[in-house]
């Protein structure tokens, strides 16, 4: 179920404070956050946010196309190494 429009997008308060502070000062230093559940809002455009994926921080540069998505969608938590390949057996005649 989608979030109600009247509630607005969810952004953690501590993250929003850091974003507004970075926008005021024009600071381009990445913002480090563990808040994967926060929605990307237009105020974040042009900033780099380091999102924690459980092991390390993944840098995410925010563009207009990212608005409306969650930060966690751009920092995958699982590494897919592929399915086990079948071994071709040689058939001798």
UniProtKB/Swiss-Prot annotation:
Please, which domain of life does this record's source organism belong to? Bacteria
Which PROSITE patterns would you find in this protein's record?
RIBOSOMAL_S19
Q: Name one GO cellular component term.
A: small ribosomal subunit
Sorted alphabetically, the Gene Ontology BP terms of this entry are: ribosomal small subunit assembly; translation
* Coiled-coil portions: none
Give any GO molecular function from the UniProt entry: structural constituent of ribosome
For whether the record's keyword set contains Plastid, the answer is: no
Would the keyword rRNA-binding turn up in this protein's UniProt record? yes
Any Pfam family from its record, for instance, is: Ribosomal_S19
Q: Which UniProt keywords apply?
A: Ribonucleoprotein, Ribosomal protein, RNA-binding, rRNA-binding
> Which NCBIfam families is this protein grouped with?
rpsS_bact
What the record says about family reads: Belongs to the universal ribosomal protein uS19 family.
Which function does this protein serve? Protein S19 forms a complex with S13 that binds strongly to the 16S ribosomal RNA.
User: What is the protein name for this chain?
Assistant: Small ribosomal subunit protein uS19
